[in-house]
């Protein structure tokens, strides 16, 4: 079993073994920030499409009187390279989406397919997670049973609390301390030790590379599980902050949105079970993170303690994604008015809030005297589908997982009424039980193609080419799925009536995201050729004066830097 795992992750294993070489390659390129760029600030506006930026920058009929509605992003674009053909990861879930940005790799290399996925070489957690993954046995150095891997809010001590239930933490101070090791899947090959998020990712990250080269690093996100950004060993981040986005909403004294709205008392009392359930409350959640980022720009840590301005830092915004996808029963529907991506009033407000927040961030960079030597990258982990909400169809009754309910592990099966559920949004990612024929399962799905509104199905060579050959045998990847199904555009397998969109799939609306790379010394430029969010990673390390090959995934996959950045930097 140990041999199997070494073979299937050969690229990652070799990269880890060459840690000294990696450090030397980084050092050979010079000290962090030895060139023009001293800092890189990375912002992910989750859900924001390339067309969202186009519309808000130019204006669109029927919205805001036809006038532009993102003045700060539009101003940023005047000294930025705009990559209009950017694609996110596939699957386009947040977990692999962020992994692509910070590693330069795809799921076959990083091992991150979804926040809730499957690994045939691990065993279940000791206790049931907050999202329903049951605990189970683990025999040290024995044969693994395989398990669903839960890396969302379920690994928190208490995901109803903004601090994730972190022992002794302040009310708003979520982060690594929020992780309950009893909620983590276990690795029998290491004596059943819990697999922390930073050890779940197979490759190093931009944060671990910059940290190893002497740079101070920080990241802000939505779950403690996104601390995978620290990279293997967990030492790549000096400051990680992740207030739990799926916690109960509380008042936030001293926090106000960039639009000037105070967050105490609670803005929307009708939806307090999660920050993601309300157009208003999600802005306060993001404002809390912006406040932490502003502290970091000022040379403090996220709590205001003494630190230094990071060489590499950033955060994600949730508000646009919520504005795109939520149907708030007591308020109204978000999303779009038409296929041209004209936003509804609710989505418009979220875009304006994020834009105002970015204005605050830029002003803070200027106030700290570091704007000129900061490279600012604005992109998105994923898009959202469908933009044309009339095409939205949520079907939780006939999905690939329900059709194959007896052929997939019980932890993934819809037949498990108290379990965490299948990995299905506007994509279905399927891992089969040991011994189940892939060809037979595919034939079954084809028999129900009209029921599941089948778009495309990937298995065998069509899957292995980009995702490795998955399976239980030596030489097969224990994490790679057996089958991937993408439905017709607009169809999601969630069955949700509180959503009017989703992501995870391969559709254009899922994957064509905003990408701006900006610096005050840049000349505005539009690049129309296709690029990927994975190219952000080598672009960042190169801008900071380090070698792109210090990134494991770059060496393995050959990921290139984004075009034109270096030319703009040296002009």
List each language-model region with its residue ranges.
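Loop/turn elements at helix/coil->beta-strand transitions in domains of secreted/extracellular proteins
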Residues: 36-41, 79-83, 109, 137, ...
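Acidic/histidine-rich catalytic neighborhood
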Residues: 373, 380-435
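Short, structured active-site-proximal loop/turn typified by the sulfatase FGly-forming signature C/S-X-P-X-R
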Residues: 53-111, 216-218
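Active-site His/acidic residue clusters
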Residues: 223-224, 228-239, 300-353, 390-392
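Catalytic-site neighborhoods of secreted/periplasmic enzymes
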Residues: 144-149, 153-189, 193-260, 551
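Short, solvent-exposed turn/loop segments enriched in Gly/Ser/Thr/Pro and often Arg
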Residues: 82-102, 220-230, 316-318, 554-561
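Metal-dependent active-site segment of extracytoplasmic phospho-/sulfohydrolases and closely related
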Residues: 352-395, 466, 540
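Active-site neighborhoods of enzymes that stabilize oxyanions during catalysis
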Residues: 173-186, 199-204, 414-539
């Amino acid at each position: 079993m140990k041999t199997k795992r070494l073979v299937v992750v050969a690229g990652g294993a070799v990269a880890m073994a060459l840690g000294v070489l990696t450090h030397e390659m980084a050092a050979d390129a010079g000290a962090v920030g030895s060139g023009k760029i001293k800092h890189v600030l990375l912002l992910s506006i989750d859900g924001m499409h390339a067309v969202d930026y186009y519309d808000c920058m130019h204006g669109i009929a029927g919205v805001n009187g036809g006038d532009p509605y993102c003045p700060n992003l539009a101003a940023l674009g005047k000294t930025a390279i705009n990559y209009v053909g950017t694609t996110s990861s596939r699957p386009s879930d947040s977990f692999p989406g962020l992994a692509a940005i910070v590693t330069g790799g795809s799921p076959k290399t990083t091992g991150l397919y979804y926040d809730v996925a499957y690994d045939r070489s691990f065993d279940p957690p000791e206790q049931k997670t907050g999202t329903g993954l049951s605990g189970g046995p683990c025999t040290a150095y024995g044969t693994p049973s395989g398990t669903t891997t839960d890396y969302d809010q379920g690994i928190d001590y208490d995901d109803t609390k903004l601090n994730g239930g972190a022992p002794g933490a302040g009310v708003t101070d979520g982060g690594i301390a929020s992780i309950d090791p009893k909620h983590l899947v276990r690795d029998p090959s290491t004596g059943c030790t819990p697999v922390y998020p930073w050890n779940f990712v197979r490759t190093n990250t931009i944060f671990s590379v910059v940290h190893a080269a002497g740079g101070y690093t920080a990241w802000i996100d939505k779950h403690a599980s996104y601390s995978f950004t620290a990279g293997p060993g967990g030492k790549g981040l000096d400051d990680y902050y992740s207030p739990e986005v799926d916690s109960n909403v509380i008042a936030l004294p001293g926090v106000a949105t960039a639009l000037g709205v105070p967050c105490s008392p609670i803005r929307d009392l009708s939806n307090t079970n999660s920050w993601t359930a309300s157009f208003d409350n999600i802005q306060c959640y993001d404002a809390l993170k912006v406040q932490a980022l502003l502290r970091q720009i000022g040379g403090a840590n996220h709590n205001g303690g003494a630190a230094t301005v990071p060489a590499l830092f950033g955060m994600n915004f949730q508000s646009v994604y919520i504005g795109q996808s939520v149907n708030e029963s007591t308020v109204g529907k978000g999303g779009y008015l038409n296929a041209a991506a004209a936003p509804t009033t609710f989505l418009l407000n979220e875009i304006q809030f994020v834009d105002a927040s970015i204005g605050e961030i830029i002003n803070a960079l200027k106030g700290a005297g570091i704007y000129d030597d900061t490279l600012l990258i604005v992109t998105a982990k994923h898009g959202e589908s469908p933009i044309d909400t009339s095409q939205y169809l949520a079907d939780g009754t006939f999905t690939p997982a329900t059709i194959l309910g007896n052929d997939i592990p019980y932890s993934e099966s819809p037949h498990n009424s108290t379990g965490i559920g299948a990995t299905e949004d506007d994509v279905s990612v399927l891992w089969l039980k040991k011994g189940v024929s892939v060809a037979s399962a595919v034939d079954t799905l084809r028999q129900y193609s009209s029921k599941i509104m089948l778009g495309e199905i990937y298995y065998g060579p069509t899957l292995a080419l980009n995702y490795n050959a998955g399976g239980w045998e030596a030489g097969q990847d224990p994490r790679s799925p057996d089958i991937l199904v993408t439905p017709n555009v607009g169809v999601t397998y969630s069955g949700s009536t509180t959503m009017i969109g989703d992501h995870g799939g391969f559709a254009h609306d899922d994957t064509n995201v905003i990408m701006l790379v900006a610096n005050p010394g840049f000349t505005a430029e539009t690049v129309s050729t296709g690029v990927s969010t994975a190219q952000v990673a080598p672009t960042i390390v190169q801008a900071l004066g380090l070698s792109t090959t210090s990134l494991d995934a770059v060496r393995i996959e050959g990921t290139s830097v984004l075009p034109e950045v270096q030319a703009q930097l040296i002009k």
